[in-house]
Amino acid sequence: MMYKRMTILSVVFMLMFSTLYLRLFVIVQNEEYVSAGKKQGTYTINAGHTNGNIYDRNMNSLVNREYEYYAVINPTPEAAEEILPFIRDKDEYYGSLVYGKPFLCSVTSGKFKSEDITAFKVPVRYGKNSIAHHITGYTANGEGVCGIEYAYNDFLRSAESVNSVTYTVNGYGTALDGIKKDVYNGGEMKSGVVLTIDRYIQAICELAGRNIKKGAITVMDIYSGDILAMASFPDYDLENLDKAVLDEDSPLINRCLYSYGVGSIFKLVTAQAAFEQGLNEDFSYCCTGSVEVDGQIFKCHDLGGHGEQNMTEAMANSCNTYFIELSKHIDNQFFIDTAKRMGFGMSIPLASGMTASGGNLQTLEDLELPAEKANMSFGQGKLLAAPLQVCAFTCAIANEGNYCVPRLVKGITDDKITVSGGEPEKITRVMDRETAFRLQDLMIAAVDKNPDSNARPSNNHAAGKTSTTQTARFDEDGTEICHGWITGFFPLSSPKYAVTVLCEDGGYGNDCAAPVFKEIIERMTNINY
């Protein structure tokens, strides 16, 4: 009996095993099950990434400053209900929801109760309130196109922080219940390029220049050559670059690096050369409003003439004919060499793809023509320079004769603490201290001691020189279109900063550029710079 029962059980087990084997064989041979089996495993969703930062001198980021939220959702009924009020694009959300698989969506909040929702706070490369566009540049298709984004493209793109969520899924891509998801948060991006720019001074300049239709503002540290701000106008909208390309005002040009006629600012170089050739402030000349040079008539802006004046008075009055006369006593080669020492005619490389134009400086052959030398004496004719060049030579005057090569990049950082690989400061003496002090006095007379100057700040003291540069272009009323300039330094008690403002096609320097210069100094003084 026992044997018979064992035989029956054995037969039953064999039948059950055979049935199971046949069932497994059918499953294995079924293409749908084979395909589903191959898909089983893990499924990772990336939820935003961050590339290397671009920092100012104080490690304040100029990019990645604003944030948006992304959520990865495993679409259970409870999770789908909780996240719905915070969805930015509901059409896209519903389109993904129908598949029942985990997916990524843009949301307005980063806080959710459901375990099936994982939210991330992701930096926006360029937010609505971003600044310094002409310095940072922009990207397209994940690559830097211009500015620092282009110059340091490989480094910035190699530094990447990525957020992700990984699920264990079945053959149809649906998250398996009871198996914990893996969440990876890329964390704060610390690697980046460190600039000499001061974010707050840059913001002040962009605010002060809000009414400049076309132009540029540059601020430098006179002791190091560090560029603290470089604002170009008009700015452009990073979300609408096609419009910027077609804009007749060319907003994509960085006008701080572009060359223009300099005008009366160059009278400081003429004065410097005169000092170094033995002339002094007592050199006098009677301005009658115009003067003839080699058959060409040169007019002063005061057609009635300034009368008898010395160099200090001529600088304050910006008398063209005085400096034409002064230049006659300067050796031609020495005149050119003096301008070169002050950076005129020399380009200024800042980073790959970012170089201030060398402009144009008259040659020795040019100055053999008396009329061309007359033009150069007050910054007209063939003479061209970029606002950054003008700011750099202003630094040399304020820094007692030491010329600092402008610098934009301090280096790179991997930890937001240490900086390496930057260009060192380059400082050269270009005039003696006495000459620098005498030029400072001329600039003080032109602004701080000039009641007609619109550049005098109400809460500080500054020195400077304005320019109104002729362009030989005229408006519909026949009035000549001019560029307005001012360059100067402050505070007088202990000079620290040089400021240069250009208003392209803006008119008289004292009318368009000087008030901007004044506002910048007042705002910087208010925040104790």
PLM features: residue spans?
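Short pre-catalytic segments that frame enzyme active sites
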Residues: N30-T44, N64-Y67, V72-E81, D177-M189, ...
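Hydrophobic alpha-helical transmembrane signal-anchor segments
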Residues: M1-E31
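Hydrophobic alpha-helical segments, especially N-terminal targeting/anchoring helices
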Residues: G48, Y55-D56, L156-N163, Y167-V169, ...
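Beta-lactam-recognizing serine transpeptidase/beta-lactamase-like catalytic domain environment
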Residues: S61-V63, I222-S264, V269-D505, G509, ...
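Short loop/turn microsegments at loop-to-beta-strand junctions
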Residues: H49-N51, K214-I217, S458
